[in-house]
């Protein structure tokens, strides 16, 4: 299936989708692509807010803000790999039987599935600025991500 169709399906059947992705065979480039899609769309979701901030405070240009955000997101790549390994090790302590690859698949796919919410959050944040509504939306998105990740990790670890 297409990536977008799988993302939509993951919101109502995350275990089935991650099972299908795992059954398609082990492919590190595919898993890295999921992480890259997340990072790219995270960058896109930040752009409207950074544009607003550049208009409100022209001391730092939009290009400088975008460059900093892009470098910051790229710097997170090793962190996500470590987070996936930690998730796998915790699952292993709880009786999981998967491999480190399965932990990466679960985390990176859950991150990719959270991108529609991130894009919406970025849009709202660019219109409203920071405030309680944006904080509440961010918290809701975080809870949705944790739910997706825990269900997917549980599936790939065989629990």
Where do the PLM segments sit?
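A generic, lipid-embedded transmembrane alpha helix
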Residues: 41-47, 114-119
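Hydrophobic alpha-helical transmembrane segments and adjacent short intramembrane/lumenal linkers
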Residues: 65-74, 80-159
């Amino acid at each position: 299936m297409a990536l977008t169709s799988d993302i939509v399906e993951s919101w109502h059947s995350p275990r089935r989708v991650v099972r299908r992705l795992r059954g398609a065979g082990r492919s590190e480039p595919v898993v890295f692509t999921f992480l890259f899609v997340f990072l790219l769309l995270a960058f896109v979701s930040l752009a409207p807010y950074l544009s607003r901030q550049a208009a409100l405070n022209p001391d730092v240009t939009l290009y400088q803000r975008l460059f900093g955000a892009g470098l910051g997101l790229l710097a997170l790549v090793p962190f996500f790999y470590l987070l996936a390994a930690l998730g796998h090790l915790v699952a292993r302590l709880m009786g999981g039987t998967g491999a480190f690859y399965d932990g990466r698949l679960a985390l990176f796919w859950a991150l990719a599935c959270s991108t529609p919410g991130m894009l919406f959050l970025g849009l709202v944040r660019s219109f409203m600025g920071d405030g309680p509504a944006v904080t509440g939306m961010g918290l809701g998105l975080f809870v949705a991500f944790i739910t997706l990740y825990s269900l997917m990790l549980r599936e790939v670890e065989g629990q």
